[in-house]
């Protein structure tokens, strides 16, 4: 009997992958959920918003799980799903956009980390764009670069420790707010329709809270992105569902329990991070310190996860010939060294730019949040396409009809997310994605794949993207749309 030798890069189990999914989703924003949700919605609307978002994002999570089962040969998920389903240019565009999203997102974590640190050392890091903040943020960029260079296994171990340290203060917050929970307070004006309140209809409350909930699940694709590092393909789907379920439960409890100890109008006035403000009211100063410490750990942990994923997509794309082949270079620890250094270098440049304009940076963060959404759409559409093809395995554990329904509902919810992200941000994304066209063309020529990369279909797709970018530039320059 022959034993299949496991690749030295395939070293992540279900626990490590789940840790990456959780840390990728749970960033600093979770510590502001109580106020963010209560600012424009009642307890009833918040509960309904999480229910609807949970159902929608479940189909995206299940899309990734299904694809990991029926197509375990496709590594680095969102990139390879897009390429396999819709050609090399769409695959490149998804990889390019996702990479930019990670770079800007990581620098966003640097800014948030420095701002969180300012609680302990005011005023040196206020706003996250002071000189001390830029220097320390830059140092952390290269520290995380070094950690990941030591190997994905070691980085994921550090990540698991960070996840545990993040969850401890969140669980303490849940226990404390549960201890002070009073149903008489919770049920007061449950739907926010009392005359003295200005929350509006349930529909308007839902709309405002859904905009908060939709960003809470960005990162659910974490296990899929590094599926090439998984010890067992089945672990990818398990980690995705476990991470989704765990985060949803935490989000719901963190958002709803405070409504049982404080009234909606009180929660709406608490400064961010509002979990710290809530505990300061309930148990005193130590609760505030605890949550601010948790915020700092959460952001650093997410930053590490995003560093791992930011280097993985260009690495996978380079191995398939879509990105320049230098991005596929590994070190002796099987870490994507060139991709890491290039990613960290671009993060460093962006970090320096933050010093000159923090307001423009906030807008860029919103745009890059939208940039990941097309990857959800193309992955879901690929599942629909594959489930309808003759290539779908007849003996698959998941029936083709179930896979098709999952992909279809995931596609519809992805379209809703893109719409909710805002038309102005979508146009800006078109400009950023179009910037990758020269690199795609160059890669096709260098790899002598003109017939595949530059055939009529791919040229048509590039033309549509270029025209969308030109339209966006015109609309912005004519002040027809604004960021």
Swiss-Prot record:
General function of this protein: Catalyzes the exchange of L-arginine for agmatine. The arginine uptake by the bacterium in the macrophage may be a virulence factor against the host innate immune response.
Broad class of the protein's primary localization: membrane
Mode of membrane association: Multi-pass membrane protein
Residues annotated as transmembrane: 11-33, 48-70, 90-112, 127-149, 156-178, 209-228, 241-263, 293-315, 335-357, 367-389, 415-435, 458-477
Family annotation (NCBIfam families): 2A0302
Swiss-Prot/TrEMBL keywords: Amino-acid transport, Antiport, Cell inner membrane, Cell membrane, Membrane, Transmembrane, Transmembrane helix, Transport, Virulence
Organism classification: Bacteria, Pseudomonadati, Chlamydiota, Chlamydiia, Chlamydiales
Compartments where located: Cell inner membrane
Name of the molecule in the record: Arginine/agmatine antiporter
Entry's Gene Ontology molecular function annotations: antiporter activity
Name of the coding gene: aaxC
Organism: Chlamydia trachomatis serovar L2 (strain ATCC VR-902B / DSM 19102 / 434/Bu)
GO BP of this protein: amino acid transport
Lineage top rank: taxon: Bacteria
Family label: Belongs to the amino acid-polyamine-organocation (APC) superfamily. Basic amino acid/polyamine antiporter (APA) (TC 2.A.3.2) family.
GO cellular component: plasma membrane
């Amino acid at each position: 009997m022959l034993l299949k030798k496991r690749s030295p890069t395939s070293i992540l189990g279900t626990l490590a992958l789940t840790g990456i999914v959780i840390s990728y989703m749970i960033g600093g924003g979770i510590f502001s959920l109580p106020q963010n949700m209560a600012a424009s919605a009642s307890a009833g609307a918040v509960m309904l918003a999480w229910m609807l978002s949970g159902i929608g994002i479940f189909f995206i999570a299940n899309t990734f799980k299904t694809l990991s089962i029926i197509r375990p040969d496709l590594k680095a998920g969102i990139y390879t799903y897009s390429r396999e389903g819709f050609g090399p240019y769409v695959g490149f565009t998804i990889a390019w956009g996702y990479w930019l999203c990670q770079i800007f997102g990581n620098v966003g974590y640097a800014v948030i980390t420095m701002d969180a640190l300012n609680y302990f050392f005011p005023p040196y890091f206020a706003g996250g764009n002071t000189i001390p903040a830029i220097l320390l943020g830059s140092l952390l960029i290269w520290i995380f670069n070094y950690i990941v260079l030591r190997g994905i296994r070691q980085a994921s171990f550090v990540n698991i420790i960070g996840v545990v340290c993040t969850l401890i203060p969140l669980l303490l917050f849940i226990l404390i707010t549960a201890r002070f929970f009073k149903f008489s307070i919770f049920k007061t004006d449950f739907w926010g329709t009392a005359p003295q309140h200005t929350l509006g209809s349930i529909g308007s409350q839902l709309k405002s809270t859904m905009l908060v909930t939709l960003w809470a699940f960005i990162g659910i694709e974490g296990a899929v992105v590094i599926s090439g590092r998984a010890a067992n393909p089945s672990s990818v789907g398990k980690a995705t569902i476990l991470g989704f379920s765990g985060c949803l439960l935490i989000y719901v409890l963190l958002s709803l329990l405070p409504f049982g100890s404080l009234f909606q109008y009180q929660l709406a006035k608490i400064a961010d991070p509002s979990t710290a403000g809530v505990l300061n009211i309930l148990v005193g100063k130590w609760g505030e310190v605890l949550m601010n410490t948790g915020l700092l750990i959460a952001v650093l942990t997410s930053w590490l996860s995003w560093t791992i994923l930011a280097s993985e997509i260009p690495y996978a794309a380079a191995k398939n010939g879509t990105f320049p082949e230098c991005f596929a270079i590994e070190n002796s620890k099987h870490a994507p060294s060139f991709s890491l250094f290039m990613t960290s270098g671009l993060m460093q440049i962006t970090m320096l730019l933050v010093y000159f304009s923090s307001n423009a940076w906030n807008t860029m963060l919103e745009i890059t949040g939208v940039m990941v959404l097309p990857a959800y759409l193309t992955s879901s559409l690929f599942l629909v396409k594959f489930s309808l093809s003759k290539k779908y395995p007849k003996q698959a554990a998941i029936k083709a009809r179930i896979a098709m329904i999952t992909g279809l509902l995931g596609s519809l919810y992805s379209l809703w997310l893109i719409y909710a992200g805002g038309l102005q941000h979508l146009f800006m994304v078109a400009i950023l994605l179009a910037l990758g066209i020269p690199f795609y063309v160059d890669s096709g020529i260098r790899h002598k794949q003109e017939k595949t990369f530059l055939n009529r279909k791919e040229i048509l797709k590039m033309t549509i993207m270029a025209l969308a970018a030109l339209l966006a530039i015109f609309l912005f320059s004519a002040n027809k749309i604004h960021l």
